[in-house]
């Protein structure tokens, strides 16, 4: 799966941080798939956040799993490594925080994230209809995307009484590609470990369909077979014409990850909905709990078991 995955070769050519990050994500997923999550598996997560901060998205899940020591160690290491630098180098802290600011969206040929696709789709619709969409609408749409795709995995994290750690880690990893404003093609090597582990654990054809779509090269060569973008820099900041080619190009990676996100969310939500239908509700950390005996979580007592113990004690 690795050797047939085109973003992997692009990553090796560029020599970026994403391959190491993908390896750390793979270690986490393999650990979660093989045994209950424990202290010996916290190190890859801490290392991944120090290496490339996108796996900080796992923090709500780590809190849900009770990995407070890992969260404390990470906080201490971040403070130890970052605060002195920010204090000694003027302007470094604001420069770092600007990575989280997207500003007003615009065309970016190399950006293959979902948020870029949303902008391109809105602009294309306005162009076809002859309507100039206000900048505030674009900004509002970008904000809505971030809120929506963060709210769902967060809700599933606190509502799931028996979290499947592999599913939850995979869902949070796919969230990154939907909410971050700059997602380049080589970044998609970080979603490959998710598909590798899911394909190892299950025989569902959907994982392979999504993998195949992400593994294929983008259709850009068919759009620009002469490689004019290498000499015409303006092509990087203008829409591809005809517009359907622009949308097809930017959707080539974003839509498969969206499908992965939706499929994982449904796999997690389905047993939660079944419990609701049976009038079994759970909300971490407020609920005393249902039977939470899943990997990486502490087993808590249901109200029924507590009542039974009290009854036996009274006898």
Residue ranges, per PLM feature:
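Transmembrane helices and adjacent periplasmic/lumenal helix-loop junctions
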Residues: 45-62, 179-190
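Transmembrane alpha-helices and membrane-interface helical segments
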Residues: 23-35, 61-66, 192-205, 259-271
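Hydrophobic core segments of transmembrane alpha-helices in multi-pass, intramembrane catalytic enzymes
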Residues: 17-26, 53-56, 187-196, 256-257
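Aromatic-enriched
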Residues: 199-293, 301, 306, 315
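Primarily membrane-embedded glycan-assembly and transfer machineries that use lipid-linked glycans
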Residues: 1-41, 65-185, 241, 245-247, ...
């Amino acid at each position: 799966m690795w050797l047939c995955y085109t973003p992997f070769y692009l990553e090796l050519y560029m020599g970026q941080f994403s391959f190491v990050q993908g390896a750390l994500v793979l270690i986490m997923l393999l650990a979660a798939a093989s045994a209950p999550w424990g202290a010996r598996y916290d190190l890859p997560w801490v290392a991944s956040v120090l290496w490339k901060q996108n796996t900080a998205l796992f923090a709500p899940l780590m809190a849900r799993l009770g990995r407070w020591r890992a969260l404390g160690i990470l906080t201490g290491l971040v403070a130890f490594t970052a605060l002195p630098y920010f204090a000694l180098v003027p302007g470094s802290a604001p420069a770092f925080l600007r990575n989280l600011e997207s500003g007003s969206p615009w065309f970016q040929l190399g950006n293959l994230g979902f948020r870029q696709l949303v902008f391109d789709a809105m602009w294309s619709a306005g162009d076809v209809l002859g309507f100039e969409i206000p900048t505030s609408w674009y900004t509002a749409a970008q904000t809505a995307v971030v809120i929506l795709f963060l709210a769902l995995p967060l809700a599933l994290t606190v509502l799931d009484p028996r979290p499947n750690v592999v599913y939850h880690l995979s869902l949070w990893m796919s969230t990154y590609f939907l909410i971050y404003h700059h997602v380049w093609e080589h970044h998609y090597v970080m979603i490959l470990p998710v598909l590798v582990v899911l394909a190892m654990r299950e025989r569902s054809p959907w994982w392979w369909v999504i993998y195949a779509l992400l593994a294929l090269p983008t259709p850009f060569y068919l759009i620009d077979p002469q490689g004019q973008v290498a000499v015409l820099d303006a092509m990087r900041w203008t829409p591809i014409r005809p517009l359907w080619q622009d949308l097809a190009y930017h959707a080539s990676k974003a839509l498969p990850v969206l499908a992965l996100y939706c499929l994982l969310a449904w796999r997690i939500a389905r047993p939660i909905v079944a419990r609701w239908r049976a009038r079994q509700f759970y909300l971490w950390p407020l609920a005393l709990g249902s039977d939470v005996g899943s990997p990486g979580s502490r087993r808590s007592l249901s109200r029924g078991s507590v009542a039974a113990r009290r009854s036996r004690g009274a006898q």
